[in-house]
Amino acid sequence: MHTSFRTLVAALLMGGSAMVMAANDGQSRVNELLSSAPEYRTTWAKVVKKEERLPDWVINLSGASEQQMTAATEDGDKYLVGPLCETADTCKSKRLIVAFSLDKEDAYAMLVEVPAGLPADKSPTRHATYRYLGKPDEGMQKLLNEELRKDPNWY
């Protein structure tokens, strides 16, 4: 009886840990992903492998990420989506919107660059260049753009 009690307690603890980990999936920041699971690293490496002239902060997902990633659904598939900036100070001019599938098999991103020093009265939307990574389809491009538009300073 004592052994079965220990087994039950161990099973409950392991199950509880799994639930906490699952609930914590949406609590990540983009700059924490590659160190959190090898699957993220492998998938992201495939995305950036054939891309030319990407900045190191994009290749390594090592920029500033003040916002937590959020869950989003595209075409029935669930993703973690969030922003990453080169630095907190350059976020208005250099940012990356990233989407990883929950199974960590697929990743997409949109690199957004606005000329530095753009006057405040100029719309960043009209002066930005957009570069998609990971060959996102039209629906995924829309999802990445929607995430960018959540920023109140993006107009």
PLM features: what roles do these ranges have?
Residues A72-D75, A99-E105:
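A short, structured loop/turn motif at beta-sheet edges
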Residues T90-I97:
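Short, surface-exposed coil-to-beta transition loops
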Residues S17-A18, A22:
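N-terminal signal peptide c-region/cleavage motif recognized by signal peptidases
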Residues V81-T87, L111:
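Short beta-strand segments that buttress and anchor functional surface loops
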Residues N24-R41, A116-Y155:
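C-terminal partner/receptor-binding element of secreted or periplasmic proteins
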Residues Y108-P115:
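Catalytic Cys-His active-site segments of thiol-dependent hydrolases/isopeptidases
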Residues M1-V9:
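Bacterial N-terminal signal peptides that target proteins for export
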Residues A23-P83, P152-Y155:
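N-terminal secretory signal peptides
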